[in-house]
Amino acid sequence: MSDYEFDVFISYRREGNPYNWVRNHFHPRLTDCLADHLPDEPTVFIDETMEVGSIWPDRLEEALGRTRILVPVLSPQYFRSRWCLAEWHSMVERERLLGQAGLIYPVLFSDSENFPSFARERSWRDLKKWNKPDLVFQQTVRWIDFVEEIENVAIELARLLGKVPPWEPGWPMRRPDPPMPGMTPVPRF
């Protein structure tokens, strides 16, 4: 392969409300709306599309390296994930090497008061008022506003996608540091 594989890589924590919101609302609506604004069918990476048997750290790294724009879904859970942070910092490093911002398009799911300074310094699209994860949200009046807002996100992403430089092999990739010995996370019941 010698080109981008994905237009957008949705980076999110696979737990709780952000996970359900991405799966139920954000990913499908964004993909549909992007299709209305791109010359070709949009390609949106979400880790749920990985093939069974994939070695997921390798596949995440490969997908991110072949993605034009990272769309992190910001929440407190996001910044507690070593993998989410590795995805974010990989794309920050690419922006630095290229001398070009706009390869990270953050969307705010919740909070923001307790984010690390590197995240608070970056502007984001605030989607907090539509952060309802359950499918019943699609039956509410606010759903129409959400769809209109995602349409605006798609328009902005389409504009940014047109500015992404050509793909290069060897983009910098960060993997999270392994947990410290004896620091194995305790399962929550």
Cite the ranges covered by each PLM segment.
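Conserved TIR/SEFIR loop-to-helix hotspot centered on a Trp-containing motif
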Residues: P76-L97
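An anion/phosphate-binding loop that grips the pyrophosphate of nucleotide cofactors and donors
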Residues: T67
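C-terminal interaction surface of TIR/SEFIR-family domains
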Residues: M1-A35, W56, A101-F189
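Structural alpha-helical scaffold elements that stabilize or flank donor/cofactor-binding regions
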Residues: A63-L64
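Hydrophobic acceptor-binding patch used for acceptor engagement in glycosyltransferases
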Residues: L70-V71
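Conserved RecA-like helicase motor-core motifs
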Residues: L34-D47
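Active-site-adjacent loop/helix micro-motif of nuclease/hydrolase catalytic cores
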Residues: Y19-N20, I55-W56, F79-L85
